């Protein structure tokens, strides 16, 4: 374990992972569109779901076999753990409301983990592979749904996503207090540099600021769709006025 390579932020392996995360959902969605096959789409969903589940189970088996963590550190209480469940449910049920949560958690939370990972070990260590398989798999699943099923967030999506996030915060904070582990980084900031590094070291002020950051991310993630909707309404209104004058 001690001879594992050290993770280098934005080194070649990290950049390769980011590139694959960006490109792969477009490739998969392009395959579905070209074939117009529901069987292909279901197969892709099955593969993505299986990879996410098997990777998580393999991670638990490996860390348990190494004896590096006890049960309190192995609970499925990280946001990406919940994100795995949500994105799998969204892919299989095809329900907009599950997608909304997967979108805000997957793009807002998991994307931060991909860009600024709290990770000590580099490629080809299994912890590097497992970490990015789970986090990138969530993002790939979310973007795949957006491209193939035209899913997108709406104004009320922010409210529903926020309520689900508050539920996660409450449950996870209780677990953190009981176990003493920092699930969801609710007790203190992660070691790796990230947006959370700018928050206060004082708790519970840090937790309050964390809520503000989460809400800001939600608004930023919805902003492109709000701009598109506003531009579309303006275009339609302008076209209607022109037709009325003819």
Language model: regions and residue ranges:
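Aromatic-anchored segments of alpha-helical transmembrane domains
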Residues: 51-61, 106-118, 165-174
């Amino acid at each position: 374990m001690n001879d594992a390579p050290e993770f280098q932020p934005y080194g070649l392996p990290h950049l390769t992972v980011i590139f694959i995360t960006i490109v792969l959902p477009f490739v998969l969605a392009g395959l579905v569109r070209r074939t117009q096959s529901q069987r292909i789409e279901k197969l892709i969903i099955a593969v993505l779901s299986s990879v996410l589940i098997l990777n998580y189970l393999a991670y638990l088996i490996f860390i348990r076999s190494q004896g590096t963590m006890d049960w309190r550190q192995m609970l499925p209480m990280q946001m990406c753990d919940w994100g795995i469940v949500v994105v799998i449910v969204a892919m299989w049920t095809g329900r907009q409301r599950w997608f909304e949560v997967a979108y805000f958690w997957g793009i807002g939370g998991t994307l931060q983990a991909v860009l600024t990972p709290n990770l000590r070990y580099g490629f080809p260590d299994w912890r590097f592979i497992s970490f990015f398989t789970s986090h990138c798999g969530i993002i790939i699943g979310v973007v795949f749904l957006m491209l193939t099923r035209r899913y997108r967030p709406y104004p009320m999506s922010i409210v529903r996503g926020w309520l689900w996030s508050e539920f996660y915060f409450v449950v996870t904070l209780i677990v953190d207090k009981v176990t003493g582990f920092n699930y969801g980084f609710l007790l203190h900031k992660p070691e790796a540099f990230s947006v959370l590094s700018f928050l206060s070291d004082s708790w519970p002020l840090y937790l309050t600021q964390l809520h503000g950051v989460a809400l800001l991310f939600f608004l930023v993630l919805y902003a492109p769709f709000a701009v598109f909707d506003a531009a579309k309404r303006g275009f339609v209104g302008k076209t209607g006025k022109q037709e009325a004058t003819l």
